[in-house]
UniProtKB/Swiss-Prot annotation:
It comes from Corynebacterium efficiens (strain DSM 44549 / YS-314 / AJ 12310 / JCM 11189 / NBRC 100395). Signal peptide: none annotated. It catalyses: L-homoserine + ATP = O-phospho-L-homoserine + ADP + H(+). PANTHER family: HOMOSERINE KINASE, HOMOSERINE/4-DIPHOSPHOCYTIDYL-2-C-METHYL-D-ERYTHRITOL KINASE. NCBIfam families: thrB (TIGR00191). It is an enzyme of class 2 (transferase). The lineage of its organism: Bacteria, Bacillati, Actinomycetota, Actinomycetes, Mycobacteriales. InterPro entries: GHMP_kinase_C_dom (IPR013750), GHMP_kinase_C_sf (IPR036554), GHMP_kinase_N_dom (IPR006204), GHMP_knse_ATP-bd_CS (IPR006203), Homoserine_kinase (IPR000870), Ribosomal_Su5_D2-typ_SF (IPR020568), Ribsml_uS5_D2-typ_fold_subgr (IPR014721). ATP binds at residues 95-105. This is Homoserine kinase. One of its GO terms (biological process) is threonine biosynthetic process.
């Protein structure tokens, strides 16, 4: 029988955004970044109240279809807990639909909030599993949960009926690595950008990416001088160039100048990983072209604070 949680209990969750793929690690590699959404969740007498401030304000639903709300309910169900009502207040700083893990952060925030409300019965692995289920892949969600860099993977059910299993392990990131995001002023649909990918790839391209993922893991942990080589990719970015021409242009421009630039997630954000700042000239040119420049650091894991018992 589900446990009824007390009215007045309140938690605050701070969740980092993330960059997925990191070039070759399609649906596998992720990196938590220092741009954060904060979600306040309180148990109330009845009903549902949702407020959104910042990114997505006036654009996202304010009812039970809001992703944070759906994730809270998923977390509560798994924790075998019930609430009479919820007040959810979202303070969003992660640009939405830009390839910076905003939807994964929302899912992580919801599941983490439910875990805090219920007294933390869920393991870290369960939080990754539940949040990743909303995405269909674990790279962004795992990065937001674990912080730092992650290697993640999916095991599909053999019976075709049960849910996929999502798993991840964290990597210690070299302390000198920083990130610079160039964010275009338009959205990218993850579904649309995925549709352009081929169902099959050549063995030589698969072999190329396997080697670059291995290089990227070493680059992130020990050898940041290998970041340029480690961000090379043949599985997804070449196919997405036609639907994201602005992104492709900037990725190529930066890479031609020696920067480890890649398409962040499904885009359209261009991400640069480096140990030195990107040149002021390039950043000024990006701003003049209408791109928002965000200087970022590698982020710590999601934080859950119980405000009121």
């Amino acid at each position: 029988m589900a446990i009824e949680l007390n009215v007045g209990r309140k938690v605050t969750v701070t969740v980092p955004g993330s960059s997925a793929n990191l070039g070759p690690g399609f649906d596998t590699l992720g990196l938590a970044l220092s741009v954060y959404d904060t979600v306040e969740v309180e148990i109330i007498q009845s009903g549902l109240e949702v407020e959104v401030f910042g990114e997505g304000q006036g654009e996202v639903p304010l009812d039970g279809s809001h992703l944070v709300v759906k994730a809270i309910r998923s977390g509560l169900k798994t924790a075998d807990a019930e609430v009479p009502g919820l007040r959810v207040v979202c303070h969003n700083n992660i640009p939405q639909s830009r390839g910076l893990g905003s939807s994964a952060a929302a899912a992580v925030a919801g599941v983490a909030a439910a875990n805090g409300l219920a007294g933390f019965p869920l393991t870290q692995e369960q939080v990754v599993q539940l949040a990743s289920a909303f995405e269909g892949h674990p790279d962004n969600a795992a990065a937001s949960v674990l912080g730092g860099a992650v290697v993640s993977w999916t095991n599909l059910p053999v019976d075709g009926k049960s849910q996929p299993e999502y798993s991840a392990v964290g990597l210690d990131v070299h302390e000198g690595i920083r990130a610079t995001a160039l964010v275009p002023d338009f959205h990218a649909s993850t579904e649309a950008v995925r549709r352009v990918l081929p169902s099959d790839v050549t063995h030589i391209d698969a072999r190329f990416n396997v080697s670059r993922v291995a290089v990227m893991i070493v680059a992130l942990q020990q050898r940041p001088d290998l970041l340029w080589e480690g961000t090379r990719d043949r599985l997804h970015q070449p196919y997405r160039a036609d639907v994201l021409p602005v992104t492709a242009e900037w990725v190529n421009r930066l890479r031609n100048r020696g920067y480890a630039a890649y398409l962040s997630g499904a885009g359209p954000t261009v991400m640069v990983l480096s140990t030195e700042p990107v040149s002021d000239k390039i950043l000024d040119d990006a701003r003049e072209a209408g791109l928002r420049v965000i200087e970022l650091e590698v982020a710590d894991p999601v934080r859950i604070e119980v405000v009121h018992e």
